[in-house]
A protein has these predicted regions:
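Loop/turn-rich, solvent-exposed surfaces of beta-rich toroidal or solenoidal domains
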Residues: 140-142, 159-178
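Beta-rich catalytic cores
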Residues: 36, 72-74, 98, 120-122, ...
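Short, conserved, GDST-rich strand-edge loop motifs in beta-rich repeat architectures
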Residues: 7-37, 88-99, 178
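Beta-propeller blade signature
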Residues: 34-48, 100-108, 145-148
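Surface-exposed loop and turn segments in beta-propeller and other repeat-based domains
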Residues: 50-69, 160
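Blade-terminus and WD-like Trp-Asp/Gly-His loop motifs, strongest in beta-propeller folds
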Residues: 1-4, 8-9, 76-84, 123-133, ...
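Signature of short aromatic-glycine-proline-rich micro-motifs recurring in repeat-based ectodomains
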Residues: 12, 66-78
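Predominantly a core beta-strand signature of beta-propeller blades
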Residues: 49-52, 110-113, 151-156
Length: 178
């Protein structure tokens, strides 16, 4: 069985995207934990003990003026070996515009790398232990991309063929999306 899980603050999801959170919960954003005490957590599935892995303060340190109540983590994916993960850090600016970043993390040593930072990242997944694929904006163009998590090098996948966002799954040489 599984021993460790990854999780996030579902009150933030409920507040920012009620259709994805728990709509029956009464959420008060003024009671959100500080940016230093909220973010991506590991959860011991046997004891329920949680540990903050990466805080919103970590993820937004180079950004100016991010409102603590208007940021969230979403779309957490584990690597096939369970030693790495990717996730989206999203925030809304003062004009209500959503911005997204794709992060890669090694769970074994706390290494964190920013993979995509051009404002738009949608659904992503691991292709293998060292490559991530998904729909995002890179080089100023939206599309499916493969990113080498060790080098940051990226290449388009099926340009001109897959022209819309979806929920990708990768298996060997296959890409399945909707």
């Amino acid at each position: 069985g599984c021993d460790i899980g990854l999780s996030l603050n579902f009150d933030r999801i409920t507040y920012l995207r009620p259709e994805y959170g728990y709509a029956t919960r009464d959420v008060n954003p003024s009671k959100f934990p500080s940016a230093e005490n909220d973010g991506l957590f590991s959860v011991n599935l046997k004891t329920g003990q949680t540990k903050l892995l990466f805080s919103f303060a970590d993820l937004s340190q180079d950004l100016k003026g991010v409102d603590n109540t208007k940021q969230k983590i979403n779309h957490i994916q584990l690597s096939p070996d369970g030693k790495r993960c990717i996730f989206l850090y999203r925030w809304f600016d003062n004009n209500g515009v959503k911005h997204s970043r794709l992060y890669f993390a090694r769970l074994t040593d706390g290494y964190l790398a920013l993979l995509a930072d051009e404002g738009m990242v949608s659904h992503c997944n691991f292709i293998d232990e060292t490559h991530v694929g998904g729909w995002m904006r890179l080089g100023g163009r939206d599309g499916y991309y493969c990113i080498d998590v060790q080098t940051g090098y990226y290449r388009p996948e099926a340009p001109g063929v897959l022209t819309e966002d979806g929920h990708p799954t990768f298996c060997g040489r296959y890409l399945v999306t909707d």
